[in-house]
Curated annotation (Swiss-Prot):
Its EC number is 2.2.1.7. It catalyses: D-glyceraldehyde 3-phosphate + pyruvate + H(+) = 1-deoxy-D-xylulose 5-phosphate + CO2. It holds the Pfam family Transketolase_C. The gene is dxs. Pathway: Metabolic intermediate biosynthesis; 1-deoxy-D-xylulose 5-phosphate biosynthesis; 1-deoxy-D-xylulose 5-phosphate from D-glyceraldehyde 3-phosphate and pyruvate: step 1/1. GO terms for molecular function: 1-deoxy-D-xylulose-5-phosphate synthase activity; magnesium ion binding; thiamine pyrophosphate binding. This is 1-deoxy-D-xylulose-5-phosphate synthase.
Length: 636
């Protein structure tokens, strides 16, 4: 059977192992061709091809529900659930998403972008099923590091307390998240993977007993008891912890052996109650380069399939904000042993792998455990260390209470470095960094800043390290800087709560924040072509806002525009509007940012165009609003 003919996963039923292996081969080919052409997550999906096929071969997916953790594992799932012919549109505007979305397919039972959610969601569905008196299977597939997340462990704790609730948890154990897994749980699972000799010995004994003359076959039932005894003997090294938590444990099994997978899943479906199936896989399976470099090939930009090398862009790009941050922090840390970099399983993405390589004692990776990362940093700060929490904006959401309760209420000097702030592009709504300004600026004691470019980022890293009066956060975007000259060392801090004027004009005041400062300058140049002169301010800080600079300018010029790459509701523009009203300055103000809607996956420039946030669009709206039409009301 051709993969292209499969429109429903139930079509896998009745296929021979040889046919299923051929489907697996076709999935890998399509997966590799698509990611090589357009980019995306490569290694995770390649590792679960056989797991997906075997599981779906044992389920009735018109009834049964499968919940995937960390949706980038689910590319094979997408191909087997009617999206093969659209798979080439993966992560592109108006194409299929790189993660799971309930609105995209009836087979996507729960949306997933962040990690460690599948067991909680699956247990909720299983309890709902039982409450309604229905009868279908619920399977939660967790892996790619997600079992290191606290929520997953909370869900296991709850599920194990419900012996009559049928729920299957499948662990895709590839020893990785994005970087290698860390922590005691990971170390324990690695021991489990290494316990195969016990399984080999018991299987070998059974085979030898079968060949004994006269009564070999009759000993098979006894052999089963011997095998069970051996399993119990080995339990301290295998599934003892899982079984003590109330689950029936199966595994570890070879995640690339279809026959073994199908047999185990069939047994597990019959077990009843909470069941845990431990599947050992290889991240990047089937593509040698990805198997050898599982971190580098976790996700890829477009690349040459033969060589594995990224396809070079037409013109060289400036270094990324993440790279500049990593260099600056590492340089400062070399002269200050109190600086400790903390990541939650995102060392490569945040650049902290550079700090780890040079100063391993000044680096901590807590795994997918954002809440722990923040409170750990609070403890470090209590003892005089300078903790730097490098974390994606979207993931800090997961530790909001810890930021408020453990850091800000105690006014501890923790430095939060929020990577991927703003519009992130192809990862879509689960990963957009649009909300941090709004959810952080309402917290007392917290200072919040954003650099206009990569050179100012270097200065703000120094500012954050030097700021010992309380917590401070810096937000910065994904991708390349704007191309300004950089210093290797000797950076001067910026003054807390002070912005700067970059351009003077008497007709309209443009106040930009972070990435939108350079765009404000572009808008000013376009307006100049229409005879409109703008003052441009780089705010630098949303909290404390430089009211000594902004309020008099607004009062004098009389027309105010704010520009931010974040949500308008509660964002930077709201802060400026509040400040003007607090100072009894009532002037027309227009806020540009992201409205109250989700931003889907697309290239950042495509998303900005859809949102009316390109420089020509902003300039035209300003011209129409302030200079070609009657004056608007005070606040929009």
């Amino acid at each position: 059977m051709n993969l292209s003919d499969i429109t429903h996963p139930n079509q896998l039923h009745g296929l021979s192992n040889r046919q299923l292996e051929d489907i697996a081969r076709q999935i890998r080919e399509k997966h590799l061709q698509t990611i090589a052409a357009s980019g995306g997550h490569l290694g995770p999906g390649l590792g679960v091809v056989e797991l997906t096929i075997a599981l779906y071969q044992t389920l009735d997916l018109d009834r049964d529900k499968v919940i995937w953790d960390v949706g980038h594992q689910a590319y094979p799932h997408k191909m087997l659930t009617g999206r093969y012919h659209r798979f080439h549109t993966l992560r592109q505007k108006d194409g299929i998403a790189g993660y799971l979305k309930r609105c995209e397919s009836n087979f996507d039972h729960f949306g997933a972008g962040h990690a460690s959610t599948s067991i909680s969601a699956g247990l909720g569905m299983a309890l709902a099923r039982d409450a309604k008196g229905e009868d279908y299977k619920v399977v939660s597939i967790i892996g790619d590091g997600a079992l290191t997340g606290g929520m997953a462990l909370e869900a296991i704790n709850h599920a194990g307390h419900l012996p009559h609730t049928n729920l299957m948890v499948v662990l895709n154990d590839n020893e990785m998240s994005i970087s290698p897994n860390v922590g005691a749980i990971s170390r324990y699972l690695n021991k489990v993977r290494l316990s195969d000799p016990v399984q080999f010995l018991s299987d070998n004994l059974e085979e030898q007993f079968k060949h004994l003359p006269f009564f070999g076959e009759s000993l098979t039932p006894e052999m089963e008891r011997v095998k069970e005894g051996m399993k119990r003997l080995a339990m301290p090294k295998v599934g003892a912890v899982i079984e003590e938590l109330g689950f029936k444990y199966f595994g570890p099994i070879d995640g690339h052996n279809l026959e073994e997978l199908i047999s185990t899943f069939k047994q597990a479906h019959k077990a009843g109650g909470p069941v845990f199936v431990h599947v050992a896989t290889v991240k990047g399976k089937g593509y040698e380069l990805a198997e050898k470099d599982q971190v580098g090939y976790h996700a890829q930009s477009p690349f040459n399939l033969a060589t594995g090398k990224a396809i070079p862009s037409n013109k060289p790009k400036p270094p990324s904000y993440s790279k500049v941050f990593a260099h600056t922090l590492t340089t400062l840390a070399q002269n200050d042993p109190k600086i400790i970099g903390i990541t939650a399983a995102m060392a490569t993405g945040t650049g902290l792998d550079k700090l780890h390589a040079k100063l391993p004692k000044q680096y901590i990776d807590v795994g997918i455990a954002e809440q722990h990362a923040v409170t750990l940093s609070a403890g470090l700060a209590c003892e005089g260390m300078r903790p730097v929490v490098a974390i994606y904006s979207t993931f800090l959401q997961r530790a909001y209470d810890q930021v408020l309760h453990d850091v800000c209420i105690q006014n501890l000097p923790v430095f939060f470095c929020l990577d991927r702030a703003g519009i992130v592009g192809a990862d879509g709504p689960t990963h957009q960094g649009l909300y941090d300004i709004a959810y952080l600026r309402c917290i007392p004691n917290l200072t919040i800043m954003a650099p206009k470019d990569e050179a100012e980022l270097q200065r703000m890293v120094v500012t954050g390290i030097n700021h010992t009066d309380g917590p401070i956060a810096m937000r910065y975007p994904r991708g390349s800087g704007v191309g300004v000259p950089l210093m290797e060392e000797g950076w001067e801090p910026v003054s807390i709560g002070k912005g700067e004027i970059l351009r003077n004009g008497d007709d309209v005041l443009l106040v930009g924040y972070g990435t939108m400062v350079h765009q404000s300058l572009q808008v000013a140049e376009i307006l100049k072509e229409h005879g409109i002169e703008a003052t441009v301010v780089n705010a630098r800080f949303v909290k404390p806002l430089d009211t000594e600079l902004i309020v008099p300018l607004a009062q004098r010029i009389g027309k105010v525009v704010t520009l931010e790459e974040g949500c308008l509701m509660g964002g930077f523009g709201s802060a400026v509007a509040e400040a003007l009203l607090d100072h009894d300055v009532v002037v027309p103000i227009k806020r540009f940012g992201v409205p109250d809607k989700l931003v889907d996956h697309a290239k950042p420039d495509e998303s900005k165009a859809d949102l009316g946030l390109t420089s020509p669009q902003i300039a035209e709206e300003i011209r129409q609003l302030f200079f070609n039409t009657p004056q608007p009301s005070a606040v929009s």
